[in-house]
Amino acid sequence: MAYAYLFKYIIIGDTGVGKSCLLLQFTDKRFQPVHDLTIGVEFGARMITIDGKQIKLQIWDTAGQESFRSITRSYYRGAAGALLVYDITRRDTFNHLTTWLEDARQHSNSNMVIMLIGNKSDLESRREVKKEEGEAFAREHGLIFMETSAKTASNVEEAFINTAKEIYEKIQEGVFDINNEANGIKIGPQHGATNATHAGNQGGQQAGGGCC
Amino acid sequence: MNFLRGVMGGQSAGPQHTEAETIQKLCDRVASSTLLDDRRNAVRALKSLSKKYRLEVGIQAMEHLIHVLQTDRSDSEIIGYALDTLYNIISNDEEEEVDDVEGKRFEDLGSQFTEIFIKQQENVTLLLSLLEGKWRTSEFDFHVRWPGVKLLTSLLKQLGPQVQQIILVSPMGVSRLMDLLADSREVIRNDGVLLLQALTRSNGAIQKIVAFENAFERLLDIITEEGNSDGGIVVEDCLILLQNLLKNNNSNQNFFKEGSYIQRMKPWFEVGDENSGWSAQKVTNLHLMLQLVRVLVSPTNPPGATSSCQKAMFQCGLLQQLCTILMATGVPADILTETINTVSEVIRGCQVNQDYFASVNAPSNPPRPAIVVLLMSMVNERQPFVLRCAVLYCFQCFLYKNQKGQGEIVSTLLPSTIDAMGNSVSAGQLLCGGLFSTDSLSNWCAAVALAHALQENATQKEQLLRVQLATNIGNPPVSLLQQCTNILSQGDKINRRGSKIQTRVGLLMLLCTWLSNCPIAVTHFLHNSANVPFLTGQIAENLGEEEQLVQGLCALLLGISIYFNDNSLESYMKEKLKQLIEKRIGKENFIEKLGFISKHELYSRASQKPQPNFPSPEYMIFDHEFTKLVKELEGVITKAIYKSSEEDKKEEEVKKTLEQHDSIVTHYKNMIREQDLQLEELKQQVSTLKCQNEQLQTAVTQQVSQIQQHKDQYNLLKVQLGKENQHHGSQSDGAQMNGIQPEEIGRLREEIEELKSKQELLQSQLAEKDSLIENLVSELLQPSASAGDSEKVAELKEELATLKSQLNSQSVEITKLQTEKQELLQKTEAFAKSVPVQGEGETPAAANSTDVEGRLSALLQETKELKNEIKALSEERTAIKEQLDSSNSTIAILQNEKDKLELEITDSKKEQDDLLVLLADQDQKILSLKNKLKDLGHPVEEEDELESGDQEDEDDETEDGGKDQDQGYL
Ligand SMILES: Nc1nc2c(ncn2[C@@H]2O[C@H](COP(=O)(O)OP(=O)(O)OP(=O)(O)O)[C@@H](O)[C@H]2O)c(=O)[nH]1
Ligand SMILES: [Mg+2]
């Protein structure tokens, strides 16, 4: 319950790139080997710590399938961060990035932080997209970039946390209007109170969906 | 459209010709007039006609009105009239007084016009854009927004799914409608809630978007602002919307829980004890609030989701608040019933919450457990039926996956506790009372409740066999089991209120639950020679449809008596019972009767949900948990009946070998566990010893430095005495000094002597300890002696403790010594000071002076000797310190040895693991043997189950959504 900030995220990208797996790995530290097609949108949450502050992440994992596009677009506006995911073993998912980015830029608020993720880095032998290509795309469009594996959990934490750091910095710089909830940011109930006091009894509840 | 034409054609007696013409004229004006004022007046006129001549206006004016919406957007008034007119055409709301036939037609009318309106999807989009808060501050907005909201709500009510789909695909459609909740004008906000209700009805995707747009926060804020349950109909509307958003929507439920919104529900239930305000609105609101809690912890939700919500509800005090309502007075019956149902689901299968519930007391004098108070209502005929059902549900939920609670309930029936209870009535007594009362409903409820105390709990099934009942005075007590079967067989003699079937079905369900998986209970049951003939008699008879269910249950009970029979009764061995069935009933017939249970019309209803929810008492036949038991046993009993005795034997053998393997594995597991424990103990002992040793060492160091100080003080003393000697060689009045000093020194010397002897003792004890350590080490070198080690270590520990205490007392004595020396020193000083004064005042006496001189030199001598002794003492201390050091290092070595030992234990563990693998191989072999058997044509499926049973246990738990899953989802 005692968080300093709450950030809303969305995860977008082609079907099958591993969006749901990334979320599951982040919230439950599990991997799901079977493709369980997401219908519409699914919700997940976790607490993280940045700069000694508790930050609650509320994450909406969207369906990549084209037919759900109109539904998933509704989630851009209220999100502070987006993970745009492609699959390094499928070039077409990389090629579609431009479309995704246009869609995101068009429907989101202009300050939304976008993290580009090349997922399935564990499948090196089947790689079709070089890491450098991902880096170049990110540089060109002003995104943060990371390669991850939802299977081995490599860089998964980092992907979510670095996005939050970026948002957090933007808040510090005063870029975000934190009083407008439509930006996907909410100030916690105890913001401003000395953090040390409640950081202590929160310690055990960082991982998973611990309530309160 | 055909329909419309039909209606038009048949309505010659409807509006007069002139009205139709008027409408036509007005439409023409709307379409062609170039003056806005003119058009506005025409639309206003259409609006006023639209209620009375709904059909005509609808048909003729719809497209013109839509056109107005598209083109006249700058004028809020005309848009407002157009929207109002469209609303009148489409909505059925105002037509409630119309009689049935008429009403039906108007309903159709509304949906027909809706269909026409939404045929062009842009019309809906147009409406959405009008609702957008572009003119936020102006009056304009209000004129447009309000009728717009009402129109869209009507469209959604008429053709929900289609309109929802259009809104879903129009960009930001849903999100924009969410803004209505933020509207500062209450009318619009409140109608916005109604619109969202229609919008979210059974559409998961829209529900999620609405939740994403902070609907929970908004709605909870509104409810709080309006005064929670004391609020008006807005609160009710918000609660219905919340229910729409959460019911059967796992994603939203998770979001609700993660957003800490459960905590915000708690104040809803702070309704206080005052009986003042229970308005109809408040009752409705509270009802919805309770239902919302239930939505979050419904048994049909994924187990992990429910359990995390249950935990949150306990942590934030919501459960406690609900229990307060439960025990409060003056609460309306339907609220009380729903509160009981809610508490039930909040505690179901959640140990912490169940434990809390068990601790709740009613505020009576003396306080009674809530469980007892509730059970009183369950077996009380005067209580409303729904309330009694709710109590039963609550009791079931309390016992669900709660072995502790089951044990507590059963224990209230056991002889030892009954005596201890004294006069206060117990849960067990109430259940027995219900079981044997003359009210069939109480019989059924008590039987089912008792069955739940036995569910999946072999221990309690056995414990309950011990229960004896006192019957008529003079007759011997009868066991509970016996009494149940007695009532079954003589049931018809007793005159009962309610249905006889209900009593018998209840008792049979209890017996089936009791006997399943409990061979001892089966033996007890068969021991009464009247039971089997009774069952076979019931099953064999050709009875009417009424009795079919009882026959089926009797067949199930007999089947259980065969399947869980351990052949301990000669006359009722499995094989004999099977032969009996063949002879008296016939296998086919038996199986058919068994099938009556699951074919019963009420069976599937009960199998769907755990809550005993019956429209009226006659429907109260099946218990949910019992349907699970039937599902589990129907197949296996059928197989068991058809199986030959040879197969039975083989199965028995396989079972035995498996059991043997199991016991070996268990044995090893236990051994490993024990060794682990020992290791842990030893580790702890070593660490405490180490710590003690350190303390001792510091104590010795301190003492050494104290001795040094003493030495220094003696030196000082000596020097001072020397000086005194020089200056006052002819001191005459030294008697005072001489009288004291030698005495003091004598005492000092004695004490030092004592100290010395103590130290000797200490030394010898150290030596003892040394040898002990040596023994210990040598024993440690033999790994097999691990059990003995702990004793040695304990001894060593003890030795160290005495050593430590001796050192302590020594140090106390040294302190004493020190203070005495201090005194001595002071006295010497005082003397030294006093001498010159006295010397001036009196004439020195030569004889005395020589005496003093002699004494002083003796004193000097003695001091010297003392000094030597102290030196020796300090040397001894150093030696002791060294010895302690060395013993310390011995202990370090000891620890090393222990580590080695640990390693060896790990090795032996590995060996045991290998053994386990070997065992697994053996199991594998048995499996393949069985497969071969199978190949040879012997059906061995059941054996498979038995074999894998042990391993599957854990998996089963997970599937059932037990504790494992709770953790998994956290
Ligand atoms: N080897 C490997 N496989 C992965 C990884 N991430 C996901 N997968 C697999 O990829 C498939 C699709 O994963 P999902 O997470 O369901 O895909 P999604 O992006 O959510 O797909 P949609 O819900 O249809 O949009 C599954 O079979 C996963 O097991 C990864 O990092 N490495
Ligand atoms: Mg997915």
Swiss-Prot record, chain A:
Cellular component, GO, one term: Golgi membrane
Similarity comment: Belongs to the small GTPase superfamily. Rab family.
Entries under CDD domains matching the protein: Rab2
Modified residues (N-acetylalanine): 2
Expression sites by tissue: Brain and parietal cells.
Biological role stated in the UniProt entry: The small GTPases Rab are key regulators of intracellular membrane trafficking, from the formation of transport vesicles to their fusion with membranes. Rabs cycle between active GTP-bound and inactive GDP-bound states. In their active state, drive transport of vesicular carriers from donor organelles to acceptor organelles to regulate the membrane traffic that maintains organelle identity and morphology.
EC code(s) of this entry: 3.6.5.2
GO molecular-function term, one example from the UniProt record: GTP binding
Domain text: Switch I, switch II and the interswitch regions are characteristic of Rab GTPases and mediate the interactions with Rab downstream effectors. The switch regions undergo conformational changes upon nucleotide binding which drives interaction with specific sets of effector proteins, with most effectors only binding to GTP-bound Rab.
GO biological process assignments: autophagosome-lysosome fusion; Golgi organization; macroautophagy; protein transport
Keyword entries, A-Z: Acetylation, Cytoplasmic vesicle, Endoplasmic reticulum, ER-Golgi transport, Golgi apparatus, GTP-binding, Hydrolase, Lipoprotein, Magnesium, Membrane, Metal-binding, Nucleotide-binding, Prenylation, Protein transport, Transport
Tagged with keyword Disulfide bond: no
Motif, Switch 2: chain positions: 63-72
SUPFAM superfamilies: P-loop containing nucleoside triphosphate hydrolases
Region of interest (Required for interaction with PRKCI), residue spans: 2-19
Superkingdom of this protein's organism: Eukaryota
Membrane topology summary: Lipid-anchor
Protein known as: Ras-related protein Rab-2A
PTM text: Prenylated. Prenylation is required for association with cellular membranes.
UniProt key word Repeat: no
Positions that bind GTP: 16-21, 38, 64, 119-120, 122, 150-151
Coiled-coil boundaries: none
Cysteines engaged in disulfide bonds, as pairs: none
Lipid-bearing positions (S-geranylgeranyl cysteine): 211-212
